[in-house]
């Protein structure tokens, strides 16, 4: 009896030691993977900063976040200035896209042909007018003449609906409550933005990469809505395009030239002072990653983003 008890105790202790060892090895492996990914992001940043040093590209004008999704259950993330708040241009439309599908899934809004058309144009064509309509639907607010202070306060609370949604999910350091315009905002839209733009949209590459990774792994919304979003984000980077700002050919897709069996999903954004891309890439060898690159004050430098992407792709191939 005593021998049986002793044997059982030895087995239990051995099992605990083995499990502890496996856990420690797993932690060490994850730590090594994270360190390796951080080195890769640092290398990509250095490559861009060195290549464009003569164009006066500085660290303060570049932000990068990379999420390795080769093991989707245990993604690894690394950033270079990933928590810096940057005006996102049309990349903010990615956040409105997810919000629309969440609202639809929760039956807060109804899908109409007009909403479906607007969402498609917002993502595929990056239409600002479509985005304005989408944000109206999401927040039940509209632009127009200035409002009295009390009414404007109520209007602004409603307009912050998308902000509240992402805040509840743990997103921090972002602001997603403004429409995108080809020229400028007027009336209550301008009042909302603030006289000095203090309430402009702001995103970080970390928040953007997190959202895109949740889209591609099906965690943002249900599978049906995830599939619809991925269809809109799919980009063709093969061949050439007459449009330098084509989302497939003018950003991360440049780095995929010659890799016809690779796949790209993305949302780019650009203005006279910014050039950004949020991309999800699948390589022929099975590597999968999200790469978000924001650049400021170098909007006409089409090669900064692909320079970053090439370093990542070469390491992942």
Predicted regions and their residues:
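Extracytoplasmic
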Residues: 57-62, 75, 81-83, 87-91, ...
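Short, well-structured active-site flanking segments
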Residues: 102-120, 131, 222-226
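Active-site-adjacent helix/loop patches that line small-molecule binding or acyl-intermediate pockets
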Residues: 29-47, 59, 114-193, 201-206
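Structured C-terminal helix/loop/strand segments within mature extracytoplasmic catalytic/sensor domains
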Residues: 23-48, 56-58, 159, 200, ...
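Short glycine/serine- and small hydrophobic-enriched flexible loop segments
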Residues: 98-106, 136, 210-217, 314
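N-terminal leader/targeting segments and the immediately adjacent pre-domain N-terminus
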Residues: 2-5, 11-81, 104-109, 152, ...
């Amino acid at each position: 009896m005593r021998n049986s008890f002793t044997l059982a105790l030895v087995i239990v202790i051995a099992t605990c030691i083995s499990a502890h060892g496996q856990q420690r090895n797993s932690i060490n492996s994850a730590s090594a993977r994270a360190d390796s990914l951080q080195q890769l992001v640092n290398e990509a940043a250095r490559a861009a900063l060195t290549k464009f040093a003569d164009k006066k590209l500085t660290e303060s004008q570049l932000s990068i976040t990379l999420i390795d999704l080769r093991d989707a259950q245990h993604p690894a993330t690394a950033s270079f200035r990933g928590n810096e708040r940057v005006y996102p241009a049309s990349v903010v439309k990615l956040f409105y896209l997810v919000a629309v599908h969440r609202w639809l899934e929760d039956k807060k809004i109804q899908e109409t042909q007009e909403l479906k058309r607007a969402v498609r144009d917002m993502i595929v064509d990056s239409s600002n007018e479509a985005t304005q309509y989408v944000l109206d639907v999401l927040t039940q607010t509209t632009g127009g003449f200035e409002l009295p202070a009390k009414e404007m306060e109520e209007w602004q609370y409603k307009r912050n609906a998308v902000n509240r949604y992402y805040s509840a999910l743990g997103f921090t350091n972002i602001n997603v409550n403004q429409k995108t315009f080809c020229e400028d905002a007027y009336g209550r839209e301008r009042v909302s933005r603030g006289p000095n733009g203090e309430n402009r949209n702001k995103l970080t590459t970390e928040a953007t990469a997190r959202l895109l990774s949740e889209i591609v792994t099906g965690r943002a919304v249900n599978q049906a809505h995830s599939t619809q979003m991925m269809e809109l984000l799919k980009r063709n980077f093969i061949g050439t395009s007459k449009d330098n700002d084509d989302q497939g050919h003018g950003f991360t897709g440049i780095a995929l030239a010659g890799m016809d069996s690779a796949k790209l999903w993305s949302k780019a954004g650009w203005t006279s002072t910014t050039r950004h891309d949020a991309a999800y890439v699948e390589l022929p060898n099975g590597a999968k990653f999200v790469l978000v690159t924001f650049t400021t004050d170098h909007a006409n430098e089409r090669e900064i983003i692909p320079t970053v992407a090439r370093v990542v792709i070469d390491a992942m191939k």
